[in-house]
C-alpha cells in the first residue's frame, strides 16, 4: 500500500482557521489555472506565490541525490526529468512557506524521487519536496493537483469552488468507514495474526477509530466485509462519492485504478464514472490500498485496462463526483496491528505503518487544514516508529518505504 495525499488545500470544519504562505508550483502550460487557484486560496486566508518549473530550470542548479536507494537517473525512466526534480528541491531550500501546492501531473512537475527499497519495486514520492534538506522531517505541507491540461485544471477549480460553497451544509460531519479483510503485514515485527493467512485488518482499523472516539464525533456509516454483502460496500462507496459526506476511510487492498470491495471484487474508476454529484459536499478520501495514490502514468507504464477511465487518485479529483482530496500510498504498502488480551477479550493495542499515518491524519483533521493534519501525522509517525534515512534491517527499510509512499492529493488545503 502506498500513501499519496492529494491536497486541494482542504479546510475542514473551519474555513481559514490559520493563514500561511503558500507556493503554487506549476508550469507555464497551466499558468492561467494557477492564477485562479491563487485567487481561491487567498479568499480562504492563504497568501500565495506562483513559481513555474521553467523559472526554476533557468535559475537553480540541481542539488545532491537523496540518500535513499532509488532509480535516480533518466536512463531508467526516459520521461522522468530527474534534473528538474533536483532543481525544484534546490529552490525549495530557499523557501519560507507553510504550504506547497503542486499544480500539474508527473509529466509537468516530476516526482521528487523514485525510491527503490524493500521489494525492489520503484515508486514515486513527492516527499523530498516536503523535506528538501533530506532529514525526513516535513518542512512544508505538500499536496498535488494532478492536472495535465488547462481543461482538467478548470474542472478541478470548479470542484474547489463548489466545495467551499458546500461546506456550510454541515455534511462534513458524515463519515463512511469501510473495513475489508486483507493479508497480514509482510514485515510485522510480532507477526500477530488471527489465523495463518490473513487478519481482519480493515475491521480492526474501524474498531480502533471507534476506540479513539471518531464515531462519537461523526455520523458514521460502517460497511464491513464480514457482513458478506459486497453490495453494501459498493453501495457505501456509491453513496459517499455522490456527495453529502465529509470523510471516507477505507482499509483494504488497492491497485492503481481500484480499491478493494469484496473477495475478488474491486471498486474501480469505471464505477465512479457512473456517478453524479447528488448532494452538497464531496469527501476527503483516505485509503491504505496499495498503489491507489499512483500518479505517474505519464512516466511509468502503469497497467490500466481499456475500460478504466484513469488512475484512482486522479479520477477521484477530476470526475464530477468522487472526492475533494485523497490521502493514500503510491505503491506496495502495509500496516501492522498489535493486540492485547484482557479478561478473555482481545483488544486493539496499536497500529504501525500505513494505517497509522491515515488514522493520525484523521485525529488531527477536525479544525485544521488537511495539509497541516497530514504533515503532523508524518511527524508523529517518524518519531513514534523511529523512521531512519539509512535503514540497516528489512524492518527499518519497510518503515521508510511506507513513510515515503504516503502522498496527499487535494483540491483545497
UniProtKB/Swiss-Prot annotation:
GO terms for molecular function: cysteine-type peptidase activity. Disulfide bonds: none annotated. It comes from the Archaea. Residues 1-20 form the signal peptide. Keywords: Signal. GO terms for biological process: proteolysis. InterPro entries: Caspase-like_dom_sf (IPR029030), Gingipain (IPR001769), Gingipain_N_sf (IPR029031). This is Uncharacterized protein AF_0048.
Amino acid at each position: 500500500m502506498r500513501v499519496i495525499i492529494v491536497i486541494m488545500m482542504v479546510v475542514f470544519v473551519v474555513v481559514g482557521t490559520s493563514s500561511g504562505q503558500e507556493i503554487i508550483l506549476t508550469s507555464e502550460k497551466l499558468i492561467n489555472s494557477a492564477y485562479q487557484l491563487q485567487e481561491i486560496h487567498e479568499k480562504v486566508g492563504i497568501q500565495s506565490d506562483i513559481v513555474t518549473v521553467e523559472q526554476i530550470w533557468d535559475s537553480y542548479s540541481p542539488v545532491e541525490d537523496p540518500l535513499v536507494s532509488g532509480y535516480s537517473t533518466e536512463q531508467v525512466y526516459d520521461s522522468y526529468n530527474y534534473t528538474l526534480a533536483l532543481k525544484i528541491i534546490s529552490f525549495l531550500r530557499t523557501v519560507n512557506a507553510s504550504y506547497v501546492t503542486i499544480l500539474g501531473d508527473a509529466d509537468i512537475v516530476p516526482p521528487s524521487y523514485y525510491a527503490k527499497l524493500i521489494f525492489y519495486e520503484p515508486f514515486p514520492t513527492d516527499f523530498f519536496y516536503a523535506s528538501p534538506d533530506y532529514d525526513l522531517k516535513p518542512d512544508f505541507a505538500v499536496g498535488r493537483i494532478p492536472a495535465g491540461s488547462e481543461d482538467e485544471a478548470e474542472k478541478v477549480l470548479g470542484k474547489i469552488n463548489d466545495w467551499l460553497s458546500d461546506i456550510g451544509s454541515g455534511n462534513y460531519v458524515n463519515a463512511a468507514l469501510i473495513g475489508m479483510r486483507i493479508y497480514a503485514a509482510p514485515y510485522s515485527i510480532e507477526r500477530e495474526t488471527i489465523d495463518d493467512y490473513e487478519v481482519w485488518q480493515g475491521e480492526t482499523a474501524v474498531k480502533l477509530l471507534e476506540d479513539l472516539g471518531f464515531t462519537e464525533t461523526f455520523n458514521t456509516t460502517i460497511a464491513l466485509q464480514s457482513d458478506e454483502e459486497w453490495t453494501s460496500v459498493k453501495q457505501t462507496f456509491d453513496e459517499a462519492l455522490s456527495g453529502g459526506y465529509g470523510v471516507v476511510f477505507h482499509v483494504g487492498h488497492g491497485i492503481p485504478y481500484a480499491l478493494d470491495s469484496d473477495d475478488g471484487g474491486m471498486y474501480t474508476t469505471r464505477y465512479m464514472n457512473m456517478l453524479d454529484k447528488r448532494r452538497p459536499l464531496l469527501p476527503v478520501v483516505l485509503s491504505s490500498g496499495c498503489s491507489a495514490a499512483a500518479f505517474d502514468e505519464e512516466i511509468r507504464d502503469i497497467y490500466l485496462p481499456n475500460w478504466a477511465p484513469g488512475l484512482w487518485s486522479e479520477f477521484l479529483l477530476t470526475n464530477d463526483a468522487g472526492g475533494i482530496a485523497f490521502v493514500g500510498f503510491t505503491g506496495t504498502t502495509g500496516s501492522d496491528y498489535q493486540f492485547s488480551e484482557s479478561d478473555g477479550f482481545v483488544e486493539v493495542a496499536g497500529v504501525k505503518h500505513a494505517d497509522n499515518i491515515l488514522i493520525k491524519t484523521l485525529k488531527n483533521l477536525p479544525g485544521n487544514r488537511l495539509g497541516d493534519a497530514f504533515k503532523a501525522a508524518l511527524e508523529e509517525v517518524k518519531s513514534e516508529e523511529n523512521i531512519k534515512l539509512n535503514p540497516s534491517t528489512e524492518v527499518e527499510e519497510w518503515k521508510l518505504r511506507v513513510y515515503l509512499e504516503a502522498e496527499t492529493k487535494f483540491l483545497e488545503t
